[in-house]
A protein has these predicted regions:
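Acidic, PIN/NYN-like endoribonuclease modules and their adjacent C-terminal/linker elements
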Residues: 1-11, 121-159
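Short, well-structured N-terminal submotif of metal-dependent ribonuclease cores
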Residues: 1-51, 64-73, 144
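Alpha-helix capping/helix-boundary segments
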Residues: 20, 55, 119-120, 140-141
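Structured helix-beta-strand junction loops
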Residues: 45-46, 82, 130
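Conserved beta-strand segments of alpha/beta enzyme cores
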Residues: 48, 84-86, 149
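Helix-adjacent hinge/juxtasegments
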Residues: 62-93
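Active-site neighborhoods of divalent-metal-dependent phosphate/nucleic-acid chemistry enzymes
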Residues: 86-139
Length: 159
């Protein structure tokens, strides 16, 4: 249902950080591109991938420097189908940003996290609390700050 906020409860879900998608979309020459691509294909085939709305908006913001308004809106709407993943809590353009308590974000920042990383961590904790994995190339930014196991795409593929 469009606009409906959801909380993911599946146990074997992989929450994917924005940097994984940015490598796929913009950095085909990156040394991790092949592994990154295999990871995204596996997650799509298993239908176990989730991205937080916060991360999707970060991706759109990065792409905004190279895409026009129409392209950005099309990308935003097409993103979940392109990667066969779910956007949580909602992808509706009429939805509100995830409701998060300032205290929860501050608690994460006291663990030495940037505001953007704290938003991601708090969003995952609130809306995807039973995620098994948080998959990122910036493992050092998230390890010890999430309930999910923090792994790189390469580590996920070895499981």
């Amino acid at each position: 249902m469009a606009g409906r906020h959801t909380t993911v409860k599946k146990a074997d879900v992989a929450v994917i950080d924005s940097n994984v998608f940015i490598i796929d979309l913009r950095y085909q020459g990156d040394r991790n591109f092949a592994v990154n691509s295999r990871f995204l294909k596996l997650v799509a085939a298993r239908r176990c991938g989730v991205v937080s709305l916060v991360n999707l908006l970060e991706i759109v913001g990065i792409l905004s420097f190279n895409l026009n308004e129409r392209q950005l809106l099309e990308f935003y709407g097409y993103f979940p189908r392109r990667y066969n993943i779910e956007v949580v809590p909602s992808i509706s353009l009429d939805a509100h940003l995830p409701e998060l308590k300032i205290k929860d974000i501050m608690d994460v920042m006291t663990l030495k996290a940037s505001f953007g990383d704290a938003l991601t961590i708090a969003s995952v904790a609130s809306y995807i609390p039973h995620a098994s994995y948080f998959v990122t190339w910036g493992k050092e930014h998230f390890s010890g700050k999430m309930n999910a196991e923090v792994v790189t795409p390469a580590e996920f593929l070895r499981r």
